[in-house]
Amino acid sequence: RKKISTDTLEKIIYAISNASTYDEIRDIIKNAKIYESQKVILIKVLRANSLSDDARHTLAKKLVEAEENRFGKKIERTDIVTRIGPTLGLMGTLIPMGPGLAALGVGDVNTLASAIIVAFDTTVVGVGSGAVAYFVSKVRRRWYEEYLSDLDALVDTVLDKLKN
């Protein structure tokens, strides 16, 4: 992941705003130090210069929404692990406890001990996987929000330039 600094974003916005031709804007976008996927979306918006302002704005909005949906699907995976991991850990705790308690009833302490070991191991794995997935989701969500914020600013700049 590469981080786009505010200074870099500002330079790109000024360059697009001060560009005088379609080709100049396209070259600025192609040479910008931004993600390739952002360049693709910006070029699509730029190519829509023959559309009305409203149609171009609608297209840009749909392109950004599609990008948001793409990132949402990626985050869903780790969000699912965040919730399922601890649930499976709890199930792994409760399931071996039944035979362990039954073994305790007949005086078999060794079976109880091994059941408790399995129960606690699965609890730790479940909670651990949930914690790792939660951390990954939070970091990814922040990255994607920055990406989309940058994309939104750049799309607005291109739309504004095409309007003038």
Model-identified regions with their sequence ranges:
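Hydrophobic membrane-targeting segments
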Residues: 1-8
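Predominantly long cytosolic amphipathic alpha-helical stalk/bundle segments
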Residues: 9-85, 141-164
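Helix-termination/interfacial motifs at the ends of transmembrane alpha-helices
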Residues: 74-128
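Channel- or pocket-lining gating/hinge segments that regulate access to a cavity or pore
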Residues: 111-164
